[in-house]
């Protein structure tokens, strides 16, 4: 006879004792269960004990989380969290260095448990740890353990980072600025200062004033990935918290100190693979670099500005200097103005007064900056572009100014200039760290590409929008390849000619037309169930392999990782925390389990409880797109297992796999693409023998029935 649903079979162990195998009744109060367990080992005062999960972070079991205990769970009997907190805090205040060190070693693994953390915090544990950190008597293991424990306790959000004292923050800053100490201390100190900077603007200003940028550069140049990542994290946090003017000064100084070259040579092109955290911080740094262009992009040209009028004249003279000098000599003011207006028209401005063209925002003054940069840094290419087009047949000239304005808008859209940084994105372009003035240099490549494509298309003024669509496609396809240098980008984008774009479009069109014939559609419909089963199998296999997820709180992007996978029999989701850089854990080492039978629904996007309170700002758009949750039964309550996918592809794979486990359709974009690819391949295989045989649009007509059904048989023929 099967046991009741609320009874689970578990093992409980204790040091120097024979483990107990019991049937735990989840309806029985936890205090009564503890009393029975203690009685079996002849232990008195059961209120002094508590149960913990034996695996992972040894979390304490309470009435709130006891539903996580499943059949086969292994628990251990340990000291109650309040008594354990008192003992460890007593050890921290002892005069014995060894006793303090041992207490810290026991405190660190328990600090991630909310129950234990509350007990420590309520007993002034943070103040005790803060005193140890401020005293700095031991710059080795004791300090490292103290910083780790302090950060773990603060991560629970029970105490605000804004409550930290200025002397404490300054002491942590000292550990960042010091040289002689244990190698594990600087990354922990940098991580703590990053949390302070992101959470408290006032303390963030203190950190910015106390931590020299040169010191962060020193940490970045140490060939230690963890130290480099933490230094880059603090650097991007300081940049994000700075005003636009301060941010520009900071970035200018960092570029003067060759940070860009160091990142390009020693981080991007490092022999060791780049971690996800570093990729995210490089994405943020790139977004902040491009964000410096936003004020110019949002500012229209001021027709009353003497400086801007002079810049326009410089642009005109760089193209028509000889012609202007020879033809303008001795002319009246009206004739000279008429000549200038005609030359601005030749430059490709739509109006004789170029200020009217540059009043549009975006791109505003950024388009003028790009044109000036091109004329000054590639004068021969600039003159050739303008003079070549001004001498072409009417309506066939490529308008330089109009093309520059539209190209600047296009580049701002492709590179998302001025958009808020995503909390999870890792999509940076190595090319931007390999070149000074990368945006302007990219414009120089793009404007010459525009002229080249214009000639290939033999375009007229009426074809301007069509040409810009082709140029957008050329630039977008090449940027997606993530070229590592501007020269490589130039080579690849010039190889993508208009003819190649047409070929790609024709291939896509023929592919689409070939798959829309009625017989092909019927064949595809017959193949769909089998191929959907294949996709379902692949999704479940991917879940069995497991994925490393990153924990993200409502406050900031965190460094903690956890691993989740599906058991081989597809009956359990197993998960647990792990350190970055560690090898994938085995199923046996994952402490948490969620039976598939207990899963009720899959939630995505803003419906997920862990992103519901984060607001609706643009900066959270990417977070919503990667968030999903599983609701499941935990006793009489509904609980959630929350995920933030590391990428859009992982989001699709996991939501598809979980939908398959729940018996729901797999409706992701990735499933549609995979199904389309499989259908195309399978259809082509089925039609190999029909090459050069036309496939009719309609099936052959069914012949009319005979006039009668009087069939004739020759009965004289003997059957064999």
From Swiss-Prot:
Motif (SH3-binding): 696-706
Highest taxon of source: Eukaryota
Cellular localization per UniProt: Cytoplasm
Record-linked CDD domains: PH_ELMO1_CED-12
Keyword annotations of the record: Apoptosis, Cytoplasm, Phagocytosis, SH3-binding
Protein name: Engulfment and cell motility protein 3
PH domain: residues covered: 542-664
Keyword Cytoplasm: yes
Pfam families: ELMO_ARM (PF11841), ELMO_CED12 (PF04727), PH_12 (PF16457)
Organism: Homo sapiens (Human)
InterPro entries: ARM-like (IPR011989), ARM-type_fold (IPR016024), ELMO_ARM (IPR024574), ELMO_dom (IPR006816), ELMO_domain-containing (IPR050868), PH-like_dom_sf (IPR011993), PH_domain (IPR001849)
A GO biological process held by the record: apoptotic process
Tagged with keyword Cytoplasm: yes
